[in-house]
């Protein structure tokens, strides 16, 4: 056997939808920097790899190589605007598309795969790893709170039942460590409500059942954010390794700021500007966009709004002209840099996990408008567990709900307390990625897991 064939080779299986592939690639790049002799084959769909692998990053790491796998869409089939259709096709192609991709990676590299690093969604990777005789290391790209909900799905279903009524929707999960603030109604779809038999819900259920088989479960968070949940997960899983927040644990990068957001922010006082963004996938319904715009115009607070161009016709007539003196609307903003800017006073967000972490590391309290997935659960933790933000009255944007939330953050004692709380969390996050911090130690454990992978045939 050649020395090349004995080289460590990690197959990385990415979920190609939403904001899953990018955090996984960021983790892989950290690992590749610390393990320059280890080969990482990053497997995802062609469309996902095109977006996730900009040319600069591809050229930066000699030991990270993307491989395209079949997306499951039949030849000649046109995907509609519904994103769930593409997800459904992809799920039907699993795991055969990844098996084919791994075979190609082994053939091209001449190195047998020694480890599977996967999105935690892929419960079947436990079976693949067992067949191959290699470790399975799943990466949960969200927080410990949502992971706990999936690990404890059967307990939740037995305790609360699967039928929501007006009497039980506000029942809390006080029987699960760290989730006492969470209401039954906050749970992601597929845990207790929604179509429990859908392929996606079944995938998440099987994930929760199979994670105890994993060599280690890696989380995109830090232990000090959810200590009780982390302690409980450590009793249920073999290794629980929080390695974030990624914006603090990785080398700082400067994104292009073609819209001049940072220069515009430089002109404003500390903690005076509202930053508004709902990520790259979500756009609030037109009536809510209109209400949000009316609230911003009426309140006259300085604001920076990242909003795709196709949504701008929703604005009230004359809106952009009316707010020119105190507002700025852009099609894209360098979010991590914006949230780190001292002039930002509040983040109006959908509560995606990456956005929450960036808000914490920026020390910016939040106004929450969740839409789907783990976002409602995350927003509950933001408001009632960590006390670093507020949810909108009624759960949606109206002119009055937005103005009330803004007034609370900027003008009331409660808002001052929220800011103090998130500054304390920011320090804990900074400490976690320090030289002797918990996330640094966990990352070193992950490095050892990979370094000690043995050739499956040795």
Swiss-Prot record:
MF (Gene Ontology): cyanidin 3-O-galactosyltransferase activity; flavonol 3-O-glucosyltransferase activity
Keywords, ordered alphabetically: Flavonoid biosynthesis, Glycosyltransferase, Transferase
Binding site for an anthocyanidin: 20, 150, 373
Pathway: Flavonoid metabolism
Reactions listed under catalytic activity: a flavonol + UDP-alpha-D-glucose = a flavonol 3-O-beta-D-glucoside + UDP + H(+)
Pfam families listed in its UniProt record: UDPGT
Tissue specificity note: Expressed in ovaries.
Enzyme class: transferase
Organism superkingdom: Eukaryota
InterPro entries per the UniProt record, alphabetical: UDP_glucos_trans, UDP_glycos_trans_CS
Keyword Glycosyltransferase on entry: yes
PROSITE patterns: UDPGT (PS00375)
GO biological process: anthocyanin-containing compound biosynthetic process
Disulfide pattern: none
Official protein name in the record: Flavonol 3-O-glucosyltransferase F3GT2
Gene name tied to this protein: F3GT2
